[in-house]
């Protein structure tokens, strides 16, 4: 998994060199496989505006461009890029400019025509490719602006997260852990659910296999405008290795990497009736978003419509036919919980994986289902417009089996379920604790050899989001994202 340090910095601030920063990540149990620094080693590269273009007389694929670079006269630059047009703003590396990797650009001739620099792609500046060809910059920039003022310096970290820590498979989750490790403050994602209405799904969503998909939420958003995402959103996705597609799809991918909540958007016009989750018919086929056709069997879970047509492979990948396109005006946003073993089996049998299946296989927190949906709806209304329906809820999440069997702790009335009954109307939420774990202080003394005081132990657990039960200082309430904490030794 790739993480952006600049993105992580939205939630916690750790002023340390990259090496020490990555060392802190390893204390979470994750393995840092490497990191790379972006946006450095760039000199004499500016924003250029293409004023005129003409065909190169000695080449059938090259262009001679006159480029405004903020000086009294435009400069002539020859390029072979095919995605540039008059009026575009692009990075222009001028004579004696320096690019990452020790590359120096000087003036010269290309097939007999003078070129006083080079127009650059994102990758030539040491950045992830934002599009095929030259990097087309936002129109609000001024020609001559140093590209170093446009590019955000960032460190991209490649991390392997252990299977028992699915809570770390997002920027928000890793930032929470880093804040606890470093003792720094944590700034949670602001999610306003005060006006969110929950309603029973009724006939709109039917769960035919609740043992594989016990919990499903859907929101219909009408009147959206599918278009290119704003620059900030595209930059976030590019930083973690994703290709921006359109604002709707990009928002679902953004929320997955922000909160760890897998989401999917269907074109509502391609859904007949409502949603049905069921096992596939033997030999049923579906063309997925990767363009490949897959043959399913009766153990695979599909999301279908009420006509029987399969729309998606549950928890793995959506179908191409029901996907969001530029012509889409209404969408159905899915946020659900799928059984990890079911997703894992289907993904492996089909040799088909996705960022969503990677998280579902390891176990997502059902508490995040609603949070992710609310966050995505908020962003869609901001960036695509439209009107949202209530959140339709089918089924109910199943408590973590380990927590469901916990005995009462101290004066409490047994395990607290994250799945307190959903209330209809405004501000509908779920309880924030999964259950209790008892940690006798004598057990801490035995494990740590007395090197951790009871006060320090309590401070660490509190920083990790656990809460002491009133009047029972050895009993701790587990936060909903920590599915791995079920026994005293886990604490």
Question: Where are the predicted features?
Answer:
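Conserved catalytic alpha/beta cores of large enzymes that bind or transform nucleotide phosphates
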Residues: 123, 226, 294, 300-397, ...
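Glycine/proline-enriched, intrinsically flexible loops and inter-domain linkers
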Residues: 4-5, 23, 63, 182, ...
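Intrinsic disorder/low-complexity segments
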Residues: 397-430
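Conserved mixed alpha/beta core segments that line enzyme active sites in large multi-domain catalysts
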Residues: 47-76, 235, 252-321
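Phosphate-backbone binding interfaces of nucleic-acid-interacting proteins
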Residues: 1-195, 199, 307, 332, ...
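Terminal amphipathic helices with adjacent charged low-complexity linkers/tails
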Residues: 178-211, 384-398, 430-444, 448-451
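Noncatalytic alpha-helical scaffolds and linker/capping helices
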Residues: 38, 393, 430-491
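Conserved phosphate/anionic-ligand binding catalytic regions in large, soluble enzymes, centered on
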Residues: 2-3, 7, 81-89, 163-182, ...
């Amino acid at each position: 998994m790739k993480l952006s340090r600049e993105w992580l910095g939205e939630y916690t601030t750790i002023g340390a060199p990259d090496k020490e920063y990555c060392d802190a990540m390893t204390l979470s149990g994750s393995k840092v496989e490497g990191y790379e620094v972006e946006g450095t080693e760039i000199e004499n590269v500016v924003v250029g505006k293409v004023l005129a273009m003409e065909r190169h007389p000695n080449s059938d694929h090259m262009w001679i461009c006159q480029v405004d670079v903020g000086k009294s006269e435009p400069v002539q630059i020859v390029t072979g890029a095919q995605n540039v047009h008059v009026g575009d703003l692009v990075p222009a590396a001028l004579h004696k400019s320096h690019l990452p990797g020790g590359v120096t650009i000087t003036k010269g001739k290309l097939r007999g025509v003078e070129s006083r620099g080079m127009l650059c792609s994102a990758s030539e500046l040491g950045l992830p490719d934002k599009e095929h060809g030259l990097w087309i910059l936002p129109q609000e920039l001024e020609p001559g602006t140093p590209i170093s003022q446009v590019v955000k310096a960032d460190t991209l970290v490649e991390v392997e997260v252990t299977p028992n820590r699915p809570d770390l498979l997002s920027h928000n989750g890793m930032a929470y852990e880093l804040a606890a490790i470093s003792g720094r403050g944590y700034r949670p994602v602001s999610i306003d659910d005060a006006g969110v209405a929950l309603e029973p799904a009724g006939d709109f969503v039917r769960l035919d296999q609740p043992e594989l998909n016990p919990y499903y939420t859907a929101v219909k958003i009408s009147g959206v405008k599918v278009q290119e995402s704003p620059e900030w959103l595209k930059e976030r996705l590019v930083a973690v290795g994703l290709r921006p597609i359109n604002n709707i799809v990009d928002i679902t991918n953004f929320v997955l990497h922000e909160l760890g909540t897998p989401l999917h958007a269907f074109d509502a016009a391609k859904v007949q009736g409502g949603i049905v989750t069921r096992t596939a018919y033997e030999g049923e086929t579906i063309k997925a978003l990767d363009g490949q056709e897959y043959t399913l069997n009766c153990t695979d879970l599909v999301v279908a419509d009420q006509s029987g047509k399969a729309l998606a492979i549950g928890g793995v990948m959506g179908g191409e036919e029901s996907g969001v396109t530029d012509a889409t005006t209404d969408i159905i946003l899915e946020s659900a919980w799928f059984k990890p073993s079911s997703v894992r089996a289907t993904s492996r049998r089909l040799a088909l994986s996705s960022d969503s299946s990677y998280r579902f296989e390891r176990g997502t927190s059902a508490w995040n289902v609603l949070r992710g949906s609310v966050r995505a709806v908020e962003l869609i209304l901001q960036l695509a417009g439209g009107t949202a329906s209530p959140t339709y809820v089918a089924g109910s999440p199943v408590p973590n089996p380990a927590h469901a069997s916990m005995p009462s702790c101290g004066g409490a009335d047994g395990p607290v379920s994250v799945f307190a009954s959903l209330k209809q109307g405004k501000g509908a939420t779920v309880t924030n604790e999964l259950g209790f774990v008892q940690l006798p202080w004598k057990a801490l003394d035995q494990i740590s050899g007395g090197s951790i005081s009871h006060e320090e132990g309590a401070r660490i657990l509190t920083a990790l989001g656990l809460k002491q039960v009133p009047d029972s200082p050895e009993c701790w309430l587990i936060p909903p994202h920590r599915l791995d904490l079920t026994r005293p030794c886990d604490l």
